[in-house]
Amino acid sequence: MSGNRKRNTSEPREDDEDDYSTKRKRNNEAVNRTRQKKRQEENDTAEKVDELKKENETLERKVEQLQKELSFLKEMFMAYAKNDGNDGPPPPPPPSSSAV
């Protein structure tokens, strides 16, 4: 008798399909979250690059301005040393540093 019993295979197959569907859905959601996170990180990195480029440009302008000021002060010092500190006319004031 037990050899003639037919097993109902439709139920386990439906369960397997439901499990597969559920796993696929969860995997797709995880993939979408990962891709979204990656896009956000790329955007954040691009913004940081832009910010650092602007900061670098500002610092380069400041370095240029300070180099000009240093050159001017060296010239003043050399003129003063050449004059041996004799009472001569006072040196001109340094250029304004309000450009930065």
From Swiss-Prot:
Expressed broadly in somatic tissues including the intestine. It is found in: Nucleus. Residues 17-80 form the bZIP domain. Residues 24-83 form a coiled coil. InterPro entries: bZIP (IPR004827), bZIP_sf (IPR046347), C/EBP (IPR031106). Disruption phenotype: RNAi-mediated knockdown reduces overall fat content. Decreases survival upon infection with P.aeruginosa. Reduces induction of expression of infection response gene, irg-1, in response to P.aeruginosa. The decrease in survival upon P.aeruginosa infection on a zip-11 mutant background is abolished by RNAi-mediated knockdown of cebp-2. It holds the Pfam family bZIP_2. Residues 52-73 are annotated as: Leucine-zipper. CDD domains: bZIP_CEBP. Belongs to the bZIP family. C/EBP subfamily. Interacts with transcription factor zip-11. This is CCAAT/enhancer-binding protein homolog 2. The gene is cebp-2.
